């Protein structure tokens, strides 16, 4: 029996185009000014020091850091330092009302229904926990943060690595066979399945004929009793 659901964000709860067409450009436009003008802010200074360690350049100046961050964005690298800095920038954007977090139409109602059924809900995304909380806290369906028990990002490991799902299961405190992971990416689901989890692939756009995972086009098409068989 499924007792907890862990969901991805991009392509799963939210249109990937919101992330790539709204969030990423917004952060990119403000990265340089954030690094140059706010490097004395303790929160930002901590991120920049972590970035220096990531680059193995403890004395890297602002220009070097900015160049590295832009390169990471170009490569879509899952850099924890980049994700943390993006989260700080997006926080201001959400609070200023520059945008709202996008959710597919059925997502909020289905998440609420699962919670009412006694399921615990979690998020696992390559975006920072801060960015996850912001997207769901300032979503186009309102503040959904009360629905979630916890959030996980790449600090537990990469999403295509099996050990990441073992770490999450341990943090949640449930055996893998009671956990369901939702994602649009087959390779992430492969890793979760290898760790003993149940899986469901969200097919929001093009079909994935290679996948061996159960598939659904919408959250309200996910039949939880199937996973008890």
Curated annotation (Swiss-Prot):
Its cofactor is Mg(2+). Binds 1 Mg(2+) ion per subunit. One of its GO terms (molecular function) is 2,3-diketo-5-methylthiopentyl-1-phosphate enolase activity. GO terms for biological process: L-methionine salvage from methylthioadenosine. InterPro entries: Enolase-ppase_E1, HAD-like_sf, HAD-SF_hydro_IA, HAD_sf. It is an enzyme of class 3 (hydrolase). It catalyses: 5-methylsulfanyl-2,3-dioxopentyl phosphate + H2O = 1,2-dihydroxy-5-(methylsulfanyl)pent-1-en-3-one + phosphate. The keyword Iron does not apply. CDD domains: HAD_EP (cd01629). It comes from the Bacteria. Its EC number is 3.1.3.77. Pathway: Amino-acid biosynthesis; L-methionine biosynthesis via salvage pathway; L-methionine from S-methyl-5-thio-alpha-D-ribose 1-phosphate: step 3/6; Amino-acid biosynthesis; L-methionine biosynthesis via salvage pathway; L-methionine from S-methyl-5-thio-alpha-D-ribose 1-phosphate: step 4/6. Keywords: Amino-acid biosynthesis, Hydrolase, Magnesium, Metal-binding, Methionine biosynthesis. Bifunctional enzyme that catalyzes the enolization of 2,3-diketo-5-methylthiopentyl-1-phosphate (DK-MTP-1-P) into the intermediate 2-hydroxy-3-keto-5-methylthiopentenyl-1-phosphate (HK-MTPenyl-1-P), which is then dephosphorylated to form the acireductone 1,2-dihydroxy-3-keto-5-methylthiopentene (DHK-MTPene). Belongs to the HAD-like hydrolase superfamily. MasA/MtnC family. Monomer. This is Enolase-phosphatase E1. It comes from Pectobacterium atrosepticum (strain SCRI 1043 / ATCC BAA-672) (Erwinia carotovora subsp. atroseptica). The lineage of its organism: Bacteria, Pseudomonadati, Pseudomonadota, Gammaproteobacteria, Enterobacterales. The gene is mtnC.
